[in-house]
């Protein structure tokens, strides 16, 4: 996917990129490659693939959800900034918080935000399990995003405690999501969530399937969740 296709295919989905946004994506790619030489941020390095598999894919929730309103977003395990930084570039009014357990990734993201001129962005070096127990963050976000971080049963425990009641947890998955979802239904329910939509689409050009799961927070998460670091993965809610 070249930059012209990126621009055109987003236009077809109702997302118009300003010249500033296009320049920010260009700089994002440059910084990603520069920093990737000193730390492992992405295995995908050729420009067309980064634009398709990272930038375009990260914006896919906006094909189904209205990000034009004033929203607070928390991205759990953002890695090199996906999906939240592309969303912030396209929708600069979003109030963004990023949580990642690796300090060097946070350092990259802080540098990236400064270079791109992003405002109203906060970065937290923390485990999702401990972050979700802090009163100032627990059940405080309109949207929580996660992209292929863990299985749904695990991911729900890391993310749903951060979503405010009536807010939305957006889980971005590859094609194998159905089985994962079946195994994760109990956890979603226990943690106060309810599946509101499952959207499947083909990533253009390479025609690989993607699934986006939208989970609405319908009631408060019980105080015992999230459990201590490592427990959601070792003993998922079943």
From Swiss-Prot:
EC numbers: 2.1.1.-
Residues that, per the record, bind S-adenosyl-L-methionine: 77, 82, 128-129, 147
Pfam families given in the database record: GidB
Gene Ontology MF terms in the entry: rRNA (guanine-N7-)-methyltransferase activity
Matching InterPro entries: rRNA_ssu_MeTfrase_G, SAM-dependent_MTases_sf
SUPFAM superfamilies xrefs: S-adenosyl-L-methionine-dependent methyltransferases
One GO CC annotation: cytosol
Subcellular location as annotated: Cytoplasm
Keywords recorded for this protein, A-Z: Cytoplasm, Methyltransferase, rRNA processing, S-adenosyl-L-methionine, Transferase
Family: Belongs to the methyltransferase superfamily. RNA methyltransferase RsmG family.
Function: Specifically methylates the N7 position of guanine in position 535 of 16S rRNA.
Descriptive protein name: Ribosomal RNA small subunit methyltransferase G
The species this protein was found in: Geobacillus sp. (strain WCH70)
Gene that this sequence comes from: rsmG
């Amino acid at each position: 996917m070249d930059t012209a296709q990126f621009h055109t295919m987003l236009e077809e989905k109702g997302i118009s990129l300003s010249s500033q946004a296009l320049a920010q994506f260009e700089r994002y790619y440059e910084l990603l490659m520069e920093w990737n030489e000193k730390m492992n941020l992405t295995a995908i390095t050729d420009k067309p693939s980064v634009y398709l598999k990272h930038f375009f894919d990260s914006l896919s929730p906006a094909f189904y959800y209205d990000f034009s309103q004033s929203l607070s977003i928390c991205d759990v395990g953002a890695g090199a900034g996906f999906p939240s930084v592309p969303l912030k570039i396209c929708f600069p009014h979003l109030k963004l918080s990023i949580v990642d357990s690796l300090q060097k990734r946070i350092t990259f993201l802080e540098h990236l935000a400064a270079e791109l001129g992003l405002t109203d962005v906060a970065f937290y070096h923390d485990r999702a399990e401990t972050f979700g127990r802090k009163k100032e963050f627990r059940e405080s976000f309109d949207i929580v995003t996660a992209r292929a971080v863990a299985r749904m049963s695990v991911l729900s425990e890391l993310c749903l405690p951060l979503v405010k009641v009536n807010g939305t947890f957006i889980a971005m998955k590859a094609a194998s999501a159905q089985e994962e979802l079946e195994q994760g239904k109990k956890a979603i329910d226990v943690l106060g969530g309810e599946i509101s939509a499952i959207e499947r689409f083909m990533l253009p050009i390479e025609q690989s399937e993607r699934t986006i799961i939208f989970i609405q927070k319908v009631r408060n998460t019980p105080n015992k969740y999230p459990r201590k670091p490592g427990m959601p993965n070792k003993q998922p809610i079943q």
